[in-house]
């Protein structure tokens, strides 16, 4: 098992992360982020339903979760909260607010992650603004990065309408589109050779203090 940053030689990449984070690391262009409120879904098990100004819906599911002889209610919340920017810090702040609003001592389980549809999309080869009669009619160009060769985004950051992204990213449609995309990508890269060398992208940043890298050559022992 290896940890840390690695470079893998490949013909193409399908980024299946929720917010296209791999595409971001590669420098894929995106639409400008617009700060504002958006909806987040979060599910808890065992708690009593909560009320808060940020909660716009609290739906108790018809089927509880049963463990042995015990039965636990399942509540799916929809929150309306502001997202300051596209950083993980802002998303973590939203998640903490939601967890604080819904937790009580009776909770036995909860969602690992928030479910939401990012407003920001990649710049694709060709945006799609329609409503397909079949998932097969979805053009793969809307999932392919415009400025990074052979990079596809299998997630809600594809350049499709946000309402459509919410439908596409449900488990069953997402699995089907993943298979369809895999077939498409395999055909397109069939005759492309694997790169002879791995290239690690270096981010260009500006900072006031870059710090210093050093090494301890002597060790002082402290006796207590």
Please state what every model-predicted region is.
Residues 1-12, 16-221:
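Flavin (FAD/FMN)-binding glycine-rich loop and adjacent Rossmann-like elements that form
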Residues 224:
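Calmodulin-binding IQ motif helices
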């Amino acid at each position: 098992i290896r940890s840390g940053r690695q470079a893998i030689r490949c013909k193409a990449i399908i980024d299946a992360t929720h917010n296209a984070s791999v595409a971001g690391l590669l420098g894929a262009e995106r639409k400008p982020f617009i700060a504002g409120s958006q909806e987040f879904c979060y599910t808890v098990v065992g708690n009593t339903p909560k009320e808060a100004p940020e909660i716009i819906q609290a739906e108790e599911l018809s089927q509880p979760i049963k463990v042995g002889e015990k039965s636990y209610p399942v509540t799916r919340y929809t929150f309306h909260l502001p997202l300051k920017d596209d950083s993980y810090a802002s998303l973590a702040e939203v998640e903490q607010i939601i967890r604080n609003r819904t937790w009580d001592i009776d909770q036995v389980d909860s969602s690992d992650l928030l479910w939401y549809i990012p407003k920001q999309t990649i710049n694709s080869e060709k945006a799609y603004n329609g409503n397909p009669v079949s998932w097969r009619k979805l053009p793969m160009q809307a999932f392919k990065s415009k400025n990074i060769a052979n990079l596809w985004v299998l997630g809600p950051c594809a350049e499709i309408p946000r309402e459509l992204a919410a439908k596409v990213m449900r488990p069953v449609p997402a699995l089907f589109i993943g298979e369809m995309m895999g077939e498409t990508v395999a055909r397109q890269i069939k005759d492309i050779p694997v790169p002879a060398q791995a290239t690690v992208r270096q981010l260009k940043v500006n900072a006031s203090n870059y710090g210093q890298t050093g090494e301890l050559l002597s060790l002082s022992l402290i006796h207590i």
